[in-house]
């Protein structure tokens, strides 16, 4: 009897094995695996993400980038004719940004109506400035004040150890 039960269990397991093997060879499974591999291999970069968000607005969106360093890395690739850049130019001395100052100084002057307009609100604000926890927190707070209600704040590599 025990031998018969073992044979039955073996037959059942073998039946599942054959069904699994058959499904692994099916066109649907193979096509799905190819699609998964393609999706997993995709890599979006910050410029693509920012330009996608900017494309969601009906009009020319207002864009602000905090922490530009080298404009050819991202800022110059942004598809908006109304864009502003802020960077003190510490790492890239010849940085041709709109506002060569810290983000704290920029937001302070903006609030005081000393640069641009204190009523200005941005559709997309990209925060990629000083990567210290305290500064990222300040940049987010300032960005929240100056982003439109239907706008976006995008953060880049701001998971600092501090």
Regions found by a protein language model. Give the residues of each.
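A short alpha-helical cap/connector motif
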Residues: 1-162
